[in-house]
Amino acid sequence: ELYPQKPVILLAFDESEIKQLPEEFQKSSIDSVFIWSGNANVLLAIVKLLEDKMNIKRDIKKADVRCIILIEDSPRYYSLILPMIYKEISHQVKEMVDKSASDHERLLYMRGRPRILLARSYEEAERYFKRFRMSTLGIISDIRFPKKDKLDKNAGVKFARWARSIDPSIPIMLQSKHNK
């Protein structure tokens, strides 16, 4: 514990590698787990996600940036979707910037891109929404994820109802890899 403020990320080849680690090691030593799928963009997404989480308060206060809350507990799925979300945000910001803008202006626009906050449980998503509601552009949520430390097959629907009771106009996209 020489550097307690430094995040520790586990980049695993598949979920079986994670299961081989002792549970107490996973909870005490590892901040985030990602799954390698052969897409090098996951490395950039990991860095951006960490920067977003570390800088969100300051960025909202100083630059009035917005955020998107992603609720997903599956390392495999968020390892796939985060690079796509960051790529799409980057594309949209570039499209928004006037072609006649200087390099400096383009850089300022890119720094103002929406931040992504990854929540892996109902309670974490609730904390993010309560804290950053006025700066939240929208919510992307899985249907099934932990609530009160137990997998809840309707947590996404419950969270959407709760968020809409606070802000009826908040955009919410529910998605699931499960058929039912």
Outline where the language-model segments fall:
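Acidic, metal-coordinating helix/loop segments flanking the phosphotransfer/catalytic sites
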Residues: 96-138
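Short, aromatic/basic amphipathic alpha-helical patches
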Residues: 20-26, 82-86, 180
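Acidic catalytic/metal-coordinating carboxylates
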Residues: 121, 149-158
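Conserved acidic segment of CheY-like receiver
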Residues: 65-76, 81-105, 116-118
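A short, hydrophobic beta-strand element within the central beta-sheet of small alpha/beta folds
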Residues: 1, 5-22, 31-37, 72, ...
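Residue immediately C-terminal to the conserved phosphorylatable aspartate in receiver
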Residues: 1, 114, 141-148
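Receiver (REC) domain switch/output surface
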Residues: 22, 29-32, 38-57, 84
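Short boundary motifs at domain starts and secondary-structure transition points
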Residues: 55-63, 107-108
